[in-house]
Amino acid sequence: MEENKQRVKSMINILQLVAPGTPLREGIDNVLRAQTGGLIVLGYNEQIKSIVDGGFHINCAFSPASLYELAKMDGALILNETGSKILIANAQLVPEASIDSIETGMRHRTAERVAKQTGSLVVAISQRRNVITLYQGNLRYTLKDIGVILTKANQAIQTLEKYKAVWNDGITNLGILEFEEVVTMSEVVHVLHSVEMVLRIKNEILSYIHELGTEGRLIRLQLTELLADLEAEAALLIKDYHQEKTQDHHQILKKLQDLANTQLLEDSDLVKLLGYPGQTSLEESVTPRGYRITSKISRVPPLIIENLINRFKTLQGVCRATIHELDDVEGIGEVRAKKIREGLKRIQEHLYMSRHN
């Protein structure tokens, strides 16, 4: 899993460097439109130096126009790691011929071998096929047309909206069952599955956003709006149902996100994520601590909620508490005690109304 996370992180860094709106991408697009082809290496370490033959050391500031003009020459362009300087133009690259390559064209084969030998980012711009291919180490990625990415991103947003609706239905149903004291592990796992799918699609959309650069701002806004409060509520759901109250619920949500990136989760995986044995029956009754529901009461800060749960242990304990018992909790006076009682009643009524709408 760590290796996969590292690959994803590397890919994000690469895509941000060549995303639309960046000077480097503008220069690459100019070369692509001119159909001259090109080979660009980012980074000039000892390994790169050992395979560079000839070329002109120009060491000038990067500009899209300079890249376009210099790419007309047959050799490769060597830039610094950040792409802010053009160091060498018309360089001949001589990587180890024994390094495996799946490419057929000379330019792309050289790019792949250089990337594998040095670990540097290499950009190959096809002369005839209008394709930009990125190589770094064993990573290979072909940049897609912006229109294609936007279409895929919009489709992913629509899918996310559907799973958000599934989450809303599931969390509403769970809230009703919590007040009725009839929650089983099955309902909790069902809601966590919807969280898993939302996180999976979120990651896919983020990859599109990274590749879209400045063109992805609207998609990012839609994603932010759709996921508003969902992840925070999912973390409180975990805090409610994890077997160990002391566990860091945000860390467990992050673990769920990491798992969602790599595999489809079984019910037993989610049960184990909550600290229970994998073979735990889904029909087993479970009791919420009450963090998620009480956090919906207006003007009750997290510290007061923590005091409430420490005193009454469960959501039902809080619901059954009298005004006098609530008043005894540190930080809660008579006025706030009444607001808590009224707030819980309003939340319950809202849940029932939501189910029937």
From Swiss-Prot:
Keywords per UniProt: ATP-binding, DNA damage, DNA repair, DNA-binding, Magnesium, Nucleotide-binding, Nucleotidyltransferase, Transferase
GO molecular function: adenylate cyclase activity; ATP binding; diadenylate cyclase activity; DNA binding
Binding residues annotated for ATP, in chain numbering: 75, 93, 106-110
GO biological process, one term: DNA repair
EC numbers, comma separated: 2.7.7.85
Xref: SUPFAM superfamilies: RuvA domain 2-like, YojJ-like
Name this polypeptide is given: DNA integrity scanning protein DisA
Organism: Bacillus cereus (strain G9842)
Protein encoded by which gene: disA
